[in-house]
Amino acid sequence: NLRVPPTMDTREAEEKLIAHLQNHRPWNAQVECEPLGTGEPYMADTSGSAHVKMQQALAAAYGVQADEVALSADGGSIPLCAALKAAHPTTQLVLFGVEEPICGIHGPNESVDPTEITAIATAEALFLANFR
């Protein structure tokens, strides 16, 4: 499954990837590509009340001011996000994960600092308690 950032056309990226694979075959290897479907990327609108409340919850959990918590609209290559937004256009989607700069997320040596897990769990609990 090919995931692309929200600013990229999914089908165009798929075509370019297939062309690249077919044009860069080591030792004349045979390459066959059969696209099975694509998931559309998603870009969040971080101005909604859910993002504001999550920013406040993260700030409280990490012991910083809310303006020190950066909101980002990226990470929306998860196809489910675009499908949910298409089905429920007014719904606010807030994505966050348990990771820190040196955790090696999705890598073979992925390792998350336990204090990060505690902080994220605290932020989630605060968000759920305060979001209406």
Locations of regions flagged by a protein language model:
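Short edge-strand/loop segments of extracellular domains
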Residues: 19
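An extended, acidic, His-containing surface patch that forms the Zn2+-binding/catalytic region
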Residues: 1, 6-16, 24, 28-132
